[in-house]
Amino acid sequence: MEYLIPGEIITEDGDIELNSGKNAKTLTVSNTGDRPIQVGSHYHFFETNKALIFTREITLGMRLDIPAGTAIRFEPGDTTEVKLIPYSGYRNAFGFNALINGPLDS
């Protein structure tokens, strides 16, 4: 009998492609702050910390194209390229920095 390991995920053999078919955008982001900023996989990128400098208006309704539950850390003074994908589902955003609090497509 095989024993289960708590939290273990058993997948089929082969590669798993995350977020396939999503229209990804590549964006350059600079941290102009004096502290590291960490952004989680499903955080509405448009509403991230103001010390992150990028073309903010094109990120409305977008999140990082990284596995769920992970994050990217932007160190002070660093410039990083990231990939973003659009939210799916009902496309509503509530919370974060309270800039939207409703539908993303209205």
Swiss-Prot record:
Subcellular location: Cytoplasm
Molecular function as annotated in GO: urease activity
GO annotation (BP), single: urea catabolic process
EC number: 3.5.1.5
Superkingdom, taxonomy of origin: Bacteria
Reactions catalysed, as given in the entry: urea + 2 H2O + H(+) = hydrogencarbonate + 2 NH4(+)
Keyword Lipoprotein found: no
Coiled-coil regions listed in the entry: none
Transmembrane segments: none
A cellular component annotation (GO) from this entry: urease complex
Alphabetically ordered keywords of this record: Cytoplasm, Hydrolase
Matching Pfam families: Urease_beta (PF00699)
Location, primary (coarse class): cytoplasm
UniProt cross-references to InterPro entries, sorted A to Z: Urease_beta-like (IPR002019), Urease_betasu_sf (IPR036461), Urease_subunit (IPR050069)
UniProt-listed HAMAP family: Urease_beta
Subunit structure: Heterotrimer of UreA (gamma), UreB (beta) and UreC (alpha) subunits. Three heterotrimers associate to form the active enzyme.
Family of this protein: Belongs to the urease beta subunit family.
Protein name: Urease subunit beta
